[in-house]
């Protein structure tokens, strides 16, 4: 630093191109899947099939924990699938092709510069036909965190009155990418289940953190800055809760003793019988200690969809009023018609809430809710590792509901838009490719995918190293040149290493052995009777803790989805 060149804050935009690995050329690519104004709100809410699908994935993760930490169950390891398979497993194992397209001297924080970024994308990255004004139907996905999505979306809205797709910058579609989705879900977990004031209450996350001395875990305030340590702690806590649940279910005092839940004549049983046993054990743990009721949300949403459809049928377009089907009385507003039907004809528009009069065990609810959220976090992370677009999409429905509970309004909105693109706004071909190309594989191989925004973060860190190497001589021009030659330099390095028969440096971090920490947490959980059912008890710091999904006001959620469906119908031009 000198008098002429003081410390500066540079805001540049790194544009990375990633080639799709999964295609759906056999699907229709002419018109959108559905008119978003005509679909029911229920398609954005998890249904019975989604819940069952998620539960099967949870059972898989529980089985993996059991055979990993419990000595007497390790013999079942060969009979459990190594991974959750999907129809594009071979394509997800292929190494991804990507390139740094450019480093733009633009800041996404400024509206006019965000417009210029999108103009650059349309100019350089969108294929044109012979006539310059005509664009191919193929569009590009513009991914990033929700702030990047929001700014790009707002830039498009600013030019909504343009005469062509090019003028409106409509040839990019937006996608909230995985790393920031996982980060937001992890932040939600800490906001709901971690309080420093609960450190003296055995069984809470804060108490477990102090028990095993995780000094790098500080709660929701530092989740983003210290993501890796906070993520690892939640993973370890989940393992401890699952192991503790197994001990409570089997009635064992320690993990070395034989459990009464054993198969006799193990060596004479078929592989299917062995798998059935460990699967049932995991399912029993899920049903007794984890499972929460989400079906009530779907039931109420379907009821509201039916009411909305009935009221829509009462509207007369000629009279521009609602007509009562019983007495033919006219009303201008939907609210007036609902009040009339309720008062004069006994129609009920209230959703019956099932209020239990029995006293609840709020500590058991805390346990079940935490295990549900932590399993959802693990399954979403695993889905991105495996490049499983279907799992990523199903989990987005549950994450959207939890984002509403946590008042993460931007993530709720963008998860809804993500689902809307897949369910309605895109053509079948575009929706399929949009859903399945959410990850990149830098090395090639099974389970080595990372979210697309994680790839960008890695490349950003690489470019920052170039900036630091240049020191006071760094400028936009020099850093841009370094960024555009980074991949070429890496290829030259790899070729030289190959010719010299030099071993490549490892691309994996060594795994720390956390068994002792997990066993210590299990002891604390058992001592706190976390797996018992004792009505009336609660944590002082989490007074009256309720199941997360029961906190959702379904009527308000239904209205919110309806409002945003209508908004997308005119903001996104098809």
Predicted regions and their residues:
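Buried hydrophobic core signal strongest for RNase H-like alpha/beta domains in large
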Residues: 1-574
């Amino acid at each position: 630093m000198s008098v002429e060149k003081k410390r500066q804050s540079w805001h540049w935009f790194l544009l990375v191109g990633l080639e799709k690995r999964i295609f759906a050329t056999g699907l229709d690519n002419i018109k959108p899947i559905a008119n978003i104004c005509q679909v029911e709100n229920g398609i954005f809410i998890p249904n019975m099939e989604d819940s069952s699908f998620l539960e099967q994935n949870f059972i898989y993760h529980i089985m993996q924990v059991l055979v990993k930490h419990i000595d007497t169950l390790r013999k079942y390891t060969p009979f459990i699938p190594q991974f959750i398979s999907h129809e594009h497993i071979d394509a997800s194992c292929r190494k991804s092709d990507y390139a740094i397209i450019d480093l733009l001297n633009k800041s996404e924080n400024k509206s006019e510069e965000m417009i210029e970024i999108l103009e650059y994308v349309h100019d350089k990255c969108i294929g044109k036909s012979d006539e310059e004004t005509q664009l191919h139907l193929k569009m590009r996905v513009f991914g990033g965190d929700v702030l990047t999505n929001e700014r790009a979306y707002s830039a498009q809205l600013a030019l909504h009155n343009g005469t062509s797709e090019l003028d409106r910058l409509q040839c990019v579609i937006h996608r909230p990418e995985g790393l920031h989705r996982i980060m937001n879900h992890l932040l939600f977990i800490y906001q709901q289940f971690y309080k420093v004031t609960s450190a003296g209450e055995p069984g809470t996350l804060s108490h477990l953190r102090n028990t095993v001395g995780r000094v790098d875990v500080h709660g929701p305030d530092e989740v983003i800055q210290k993501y890796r340590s906070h993520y690892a702690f939640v993973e370890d806590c989940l393992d401890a809760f699952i192991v503790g649940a197994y001990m409570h279910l089997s009635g064992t005092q320690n993990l070395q003793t034989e459990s009464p839940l054993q198969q006799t004549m193990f060596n004479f049983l078929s592989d299917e019988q062995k798998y059935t046993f460990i699967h049932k054990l995991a399912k029993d743990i899920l049903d007794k200690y984890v499972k929460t009721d989400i079906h009530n949300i779907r039931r109420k949403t379907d009821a509201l969809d039916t009411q909305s459809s009935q009221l829509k049928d009462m509207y007369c377009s000629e009279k521009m009023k609602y007509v009562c089907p019983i007495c033919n009385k006219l009303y201008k507003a939907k609210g007036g018609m609902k009040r009339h039907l309720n008062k004069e004809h006994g129609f009920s528009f209230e959703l019956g809430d099932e209020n239990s009069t029995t006293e609840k065990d709020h500590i058991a609810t805390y346990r079940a809710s935490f295990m549900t959220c932590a399993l959802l976090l693990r399954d979403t992370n695993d889905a991105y590792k495996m490049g499983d677009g279907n799992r990523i999409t199903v989990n987005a429905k549950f994450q959207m509901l939890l984002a509403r509970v946590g008042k993460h309004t931007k993530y709720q909105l963008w998860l809804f838009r993500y689902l809307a693109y897949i369910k309605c706004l895109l053509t079948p071909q575009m929706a399929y490719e949009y859903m399945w190309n959410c990850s990149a594989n830098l090395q090639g191989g099974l389970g080595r995918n990372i979210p697309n925004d994680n790839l960008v973060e890695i490349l950003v860190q690489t470019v920052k190293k170039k900036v630091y190497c240049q020191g006071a001589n760094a400028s936009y021009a020099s850093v841009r040149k370094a960024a555009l030659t980074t991949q070429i330099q890496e290829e030259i390095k790899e070729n030289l290493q190959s010719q010299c028969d030099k071993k490549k440096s490892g691309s994996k971090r060594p795994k720390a052995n956390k068994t002792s920490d997990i066993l210590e947490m299990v002891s604390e959980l058992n001592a706190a009777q976390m797996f018992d059912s004792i009505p009336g008890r609660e944590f002082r710091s989490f007074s009256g803790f309720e199941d997360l999904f029961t906190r959702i006001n379904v009527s308000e959620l239904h209205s919110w989805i309806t409002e945003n469906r209508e908004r997308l119908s005119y903001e996104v031009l098809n």
